[in-house]
Design a protein with these regions (language model features):
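His/Asp/Glu-enriched, well-ordered alpha-helical/loop segment
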Residues: 1-80
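C-terminal cap of metal-dependent C-N hydrolases
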Residues: 1-6, 11-12, 76-122
Length: 125
């Protein structure tokens, strides 16, 4: 199913008080690590499209899911050889490995596994 051409990849999971589902911290690293690198079920470009551009287009969010002039500059810089999910049912907030930087709205929000700006971005409804 993950390789279906019409499919998109998203998650609505959250972590609250250290409790939740491991997909809250691991959905996208799992796609890149397991389904792209390990199993080859998706190319890296197709996985990126399914995780970013396709959902943004479906939700009619023209400034999301792409890199370009006027876009929101939400970026995740990761090492494709190392990215992997680590969250489990007993430790759902464990951060993934292989993510170097996260930029939200052009602001550096995460370096390695350390949040450096927890106020980057805006709430979307």
């Amino acid at each position: 199913a993950v390789a279906d051409s019409y499919g998109m990849i998203a998650s609505d999971a959250i972590i609250a008080n250290g409790k939740g589902h491991p997909r809250a911290a691991g959905t996208f690293p799992r796609i890149m690590g397991k389904y792209v690198r390990e199993e080859g079920a998706l190319s890296l470009l197709e996985a990126l499209r399914k995780c970013s551009h396709a959902p943004a287009e479906r939700l009619q969010l023209p400034d999301k899911g792409r890199i370009g002039i006027g876009a929101d500059a939400d970026l995740v810089i990761f090492d494709a050889e190392k990215i992997a999910d680590k969250a489990t049912y007993t430790e759902p907030a464990l951060p993934p490995v292989g993510i170097e930087f996260v930029f939200v709205g052009g602001r550096k929000a995460l370096v390695g596994q350390r949040i450096v700006d927890g106020t980057a971005g805006v709430l979307m409804r």
